[in-house]
């Protein structure tokens, strides 16, 4: 490679360049557009003439400056046609200028620039451009011939001087205007001159390639505008190309002419044409037509003009879509002719470029390998200028694609496309760019969205060297770029030849789309763009508008105009395009997202360019859904128009580097035709300067989803060509699937980019720079590029903001050895059964990029294993493939091609866009952990660089890829699997795995393809449940091995709390897959009960009778704060069975009756409530009982009394819930719970009975500790303040078991009420309900027994008998009611006067006797009388006493202690007390017939009530009670319908149910339960 590199000492004819600066406007235009020799000009299409006639709006001064930088080459080109003498002199000058590899590379760059400019109007070239090419060059020669001739000598001298200066100071940056023209064989010049048709072929090939990439963007450019633009470009480019002869390449015929004129002077333009053709081919022909049109229009018009043209392009594109077939045929014919001519020319142009060029002037000359490399470099730059060059190449190679006339897109002004602008390596301004590498930026650019909005980058004239980072001398960069261009040219010549060989009629390459054109144009002039970037002209390259050269590849979006164009530039820039040639650009491409290890460091300028390119705003119309670069660059990479900079550009750059490793370099023998892949249409995409190198057919096969706005190019036009980028003569096959827009514009594949240490400016940026420039991968959900997947035009119109990962933008001075390290290609992704499963999401952390690094780049079907030492075979990426490493082992054939790539899938790079890698694709295999191994030292830079972008793109790409999935009908299988399960991240965010992607991705072992995740039940819990209530014991519990996601993220949710640190005694719990509880049971219970109350209230209000009942019975609103309800509102939303996605999305609900749905809801509530209950138990056990601090404050006895057997209760609940969930999962639509309850009834009895029985002692112990143990109190307060407790006290946790068992009985009762009478399900529910009822009865009995025994013991100590004594303590005796009353006695005085006396009497009513006692001091009682309960009777007093004696009742003792009858009159303080005593003294009543009590009032409990006396009824929220009597002071006596318990309760706790229908329904349900229970009892008997 070094031998082929231009010599530093070779002087360049800078003086000529300077003279050219003063050349007339027409000359400048010609200089800007690759100047063709007279013959070439004659061959050029009328569009070229039109270009001559129309000078672009861009400032000519800038063009002149750019020309000044590139003048020698441009002038040489102009002089070509002037006379054979001038041709000879030009050839001499070119030879001299290109004697050194640097010069040769510069020539290549100039050719590429020209090619890129020409590519601006690829279809123009592809269409009628051929005829006008020749004419236009002649006109240009006529106008500027004299001046060019006069200045030719000076230019020659300047070139010589420049060469000398280069020799003297190869490392120093070449001053603007002194850029050493790349050495071009005289044959090249002659070939360029004599083979207008050849140039046309090459240009059209480039156009075809560019069209493929620019198809969506520049495909709409009118051939006329493109031609006119080409003319202007040709003229301006001639001037600029004189400075950048190597960069100029004919795009189609126009560029062919221009390049021939320039090549006549330098012989490099033709190489550039070839390079552009290759770039254009890489662009897939889209950029060819659109790129040429776009660039030409950009040259001819100001940014506004470009925008207008883009709008026209859009309109034309629309019309083009209508007449797409006809235009396609026409374009294809033109392209076929052009491709054939250019292919012949390229093929014939071998090492003997001059002879073959001359021989094939008319038939199409094959540029020498060197020239081809130059063309490739220039093509890279052309791609940088806009993949128009590549499109032209594509057109030439795939005329079929060009058959469809692409609507003209606003062409880039010739100034913008000026050699300096387009090919920094060639132009002085390019020389100014120290780190400009000739990496194919066009890949990314080419895949940009369809017709870009006027891409101002293309308009921006080449900026002076100062505009670029001075870190690396222009000379060095020029020399390096020239050297690399030379190497590329050699390798690319072969490629371009083969590329051009691609049948012009091939419809596979899509016509240029205007957006692509701009992007290609920008890409084609990446160098120029870089140079232009310094320029402040609005049409300046992306870098001009955006400080992208200095910024990371993901540079922030450029201004509306320039940024759009820069984006286009980066996207469409050929790997060899000038921008691509920028070291920074190349680095950007590679470092950002391309897997290749050879990421070159972008120069500050190139970085800025690439960034700007990535942010170029494309035309408002979104590109067609073509598959763009595989890797999605950072968000910045998407242009405003939605164009995503193709990672393929980056990939191409990486490929170029890898191909350097894999394919023959100049060092590695690579015959001009050495790379057959290059020869193939796909390879031709990577032909010299063809945008295909960057956005080759893969780019052409840009994500159609992305290019949705663009008219979909016919599949035949979109047929992808294997993209092989030859860096340093190496061929690199770029996956057709690469999304040009996904990646930052790849640096041109110029040899300078890849040469180890030759270039004074290091091509490799620091790892930080690379990271910054690495494009973010697309969302794993969608295989399509996230960025490219944006279907709407608007989405394309919005440029993504730059997301540089590193503050450093670039490190221009990186040693080539370091470059080789950094750019070492990644190991190939192992090819796994493509149909097996899509790759899992790579970890978001560094592991992801690392895993990505371990791959090979598959160039030319060759896979070079990377350091991972893994036997991976690089699978060619399908056109639509976006994942960086293709879905492991996924071949391009595995995926149906998008419409653009119907005919063939390019072998492509082993790694496609990283986004695809991240995005799960259906047929691909899961990500292999080996890929995630730590990256090697060489790969570390790449990994670090790619890592941040991966995250960014991953985040951004989700929605985009969702859209892509929908858009890509061809990729149906992939789309199905790729559709976010969150198509959801849920919002992907709603999905648990979306909410926490890091955890799922971080564990590579658990990574799985999302497409493989069972779709059985999507996490219904997201409908309302905030989070899993219980954390599994281990991650394995929560993560399904297949899904590798959190339980919340998966279709199921686990109701599990973390096990206590101490463990659960070896008891393992099953993780729930479908149930999730986010609330503690205390809160959940409140929510559920509130729901029941509200439901009852709604029913009551809806059925409210017209006539109101008693006003005092009007319903009361539930009293609770709004905030509290809001805090508990989520539980209800997550506890509905019908809200489960599987159920909601099924048709089962349609076939179910309302009652059946209610039954299912009742059963499901039992499961959900148990999960919440278990969550609370886990906190009680783990947080409180197992607290070491709390345990230290308690004695063993206290600890035992306090927590009793709480842990046993938790274990039983765990198994119960596990069985419930398993039963539910087995049959979601008809699951059963009653049988599970019956199976666990014995366990419930075993643990709940002792725990509840001990509740009395538990309460006392707790109260005693709170009163006497300060340390306990302090520790407890601390524990209760923990957020896990949710401000709930320990006491609330301790009483949960009894509350739960009671509630469980009610839940079973609800199920029983909804079962079909006589059904087996009813029998099961009845048995379960009866079992729980018995358990509750036993618990109550035990609790009461203990309490009663204690009361008896206490009373026995306080009571004394003055009468007959009898034993008080008895197991069968309990206290029913006690209280102090006022006994009224009337005594008869001696005067027969009745005297009323009162005395206090304390009554103790037991269940079997009544004690009457007199209170004494010390709470002691003296019993004066007693009677058995059977002999007592109470009744109301009918006496109407006045005064305070109102609440009186009579007590009759039929047989007292003495055996006599006694009567007492008692007075109470309140009426309720009187009624309560009378009721207590009354004999037990028979059970009421509920159906006969329809007129009895009913109340519903709003607030729980804890009884204070034994005759009071304990109430729970939502209890319905039938009222039997009511006092005037606010007390009610009633019977609870659920269990028949009777008692008194305050009216404040309840509300009346006024609707008789609701009351009747309540009675009916209660009767149903009672009847079922009775039937069960009878059966058991």
Curated annotation (Swiss-Prot):
<dbReference type="GO" id="GO:0008289">
    <property type="term" value="F:lipid binding"/>
</dbReference>
<dbReference type="Pfam" id="PF15441">
    <property type="entry name" value="ARHGEF5_35"/>
</dbReference>
<feature type="compositionally biased region" description="Basic and acidic residues">
    <location>
        <begin position="474"/>
        <end position="492"/>
    </location>
</feature>
<feature type="compositionally biased region" description="Basic and acidic residues">
    <location>
        <begin position="41"/>
        <end position="54"/>
    </location>
</feature>
<keyword id="KW-0446">Lipid-binding</keyword>
<dbReference type="GO" id="GO:1904591">
    <property type="term" value="P:positive regulation of protein import"/>
</dbReference>
<feature type="compositionally biased region" description="Polar residues">
    <location>
        <begin position="779"/>
        <end position="791"/>
    </location>
</feature>
<feature type="region of interest" description="Disordered">
    <location>
        <begin position="159"/>
        <end position="274"/>
    </location>
</feature>
<feature type="region of interest" description="Disordered">
    <location>
        <begin position="659"/>
        <end position="700"/>
    </location>
</feature>
<feature type="compositionally biased region" description="Polar residues">
    <location>
        <begin position="912"/>
        <end position="925"/>
    </location>
</feature>
<keyword id="KW-0597">Phosphoprotein</keyword>
<feature type="compositionally biased region" description="Basic and acidic residues">
    <location>
        <begin position="326"/>
        <end position="336"/>
    </location>
</feature>
<dbReference type="GO" id="GO:0005085">
    <property type="term" value="F:guanyl-nucleotide exchange factor activity"/>
</dbReference>
<comment type="function">
    <text>Guanine nucleotide exchange factor which activates Rho GTPases. Strongly activates RHOA. Also strongly activates RHOB, weakly activates RHOC and RHOG and shows no effect on RHOD, RHOV, RHOQ or RAC1. Involved in regulation of cell shape and actin cytoskeletal organization. Plays a role in actin organization by generating a loss of actin stress fibers and the formation of membrane ruffles and filopodia. Required for SRC-induced podosome formation. Involved in positive regulation of immature dendritic cell migration.</text>
</comment>
<dbReference type="GO" id="GO:0005654">
    <property type="term" value="C:nucleoplasm"/>
</dbReference>
<feature type="compositionally biased region" description="Polar residues">
    <location>
        <begin position="204"/>
        <end position="221"/>
    </location>
</feature>
<feature type="domain" description="SH3">
    <location>
        <begin position="1494"/>
        <end position="1555"/>
    </location>
</feature>
<dbReference type="InterPro" id="IPR001849">
    <property type="entry name" value="PH_domain"/>
</dbReference>
<feature type="compositionally biased region" description="Basic and acidic residues">
    <location>
        <begin position="975"/>
        <end position="986"/>
    </location>
</feature>
<dbReference type="InterPro" id="IPR011993">
    <property type="entry name" value="PH-like_dom_sf"/>
</dbReference>
<feature type="compositionally biased region" description="Polar residues">
    <location>
        <begin position="867"/>
        <end position="881"/>
    </location>
</feature>
<dbReference type="GO" id="GO:0005886">
    <property type="term" value="C:plasma membrane"/>
</dbReference>
<keyword id="KW-0728">SH3 domain</keyword>
<feature type="modified residue" description="Phosphoserine">
    <location>
        <position position="1029"/>
    </location>
</feature>
<dbReference type="GO" id="GO:0070161">
    <property type="term" value="C:anchoring junction"/>
</dbReference>
<dbReference type="Pfam" id="PF00018">
    <property type="entry name" value="SH3_1"/>
</dbReference>
<feature type="modified residue" description="Phosphoserine">
    <location>
        <position position="446"/>
    </location>
</feature>
<dbReference type="GO" id="GO:0071803">
    <property type="term" value="P:positive regulation of podosome assembly"/>
</dbReference>
<dbReference type="GO" id="GO:0035556">
    <property type="term" value="P:intracellular signal transduction"/>
</dbReference>
<feature type="modified residue" description="Phosphoserine">
    <location>
        <position position="953"/>
    </location>
</feature>
<keyword id="KW-0963">Cytoplasm</keyword>
<keyword id="KW-0539">Nucleus</keyword>
<keyword id="KW-0965">Cell junction</keyword>
<dbReference type="Pfam" id="PF00621">
    <property type="entry name" value="RhoGEF"/>
</dbReference>
<feature type="region of interest" description="Disordered">
    <location>
        <begin position="316"/>
        <end position="643"/>
    </location>
</feature>
<dbReference type="GO" id="GO:0061484">
    <property type="term" value="P:hematopoietic stem cell homeostasis"/>
</dbReference>
<dbReference type="GO" id="GO:0030036">
    <property type="term" value="P:actin cytoskeleton organization"/>
</dbReference>
<feature type="compositionally biased region" description="Polar residues">
    <location>
        <begin position="603"/>
        <end position="613"/>
    </location>
</feature>
<feature type="compositionally biased region" description="Acidic residues">
    <location>
        <begin position="228"/>
        <end position="241"/>
    </location>
</feature>
<feature type="compositionally biased region" description="Polar residues">
    <location>
        <begin position="662"/>
        <end position="685"/>
    </location>
</feature>
<dbReference type="InterPro" id="IPR035899">
    <property type="entry name" value="DBL_dom_sf"/>
</dbReference>
<feature type="compositionally biased region" description="Polar residues">
    <location>
        <begin position="496"/>
        <end position="507"/>
    </location>
</feature>
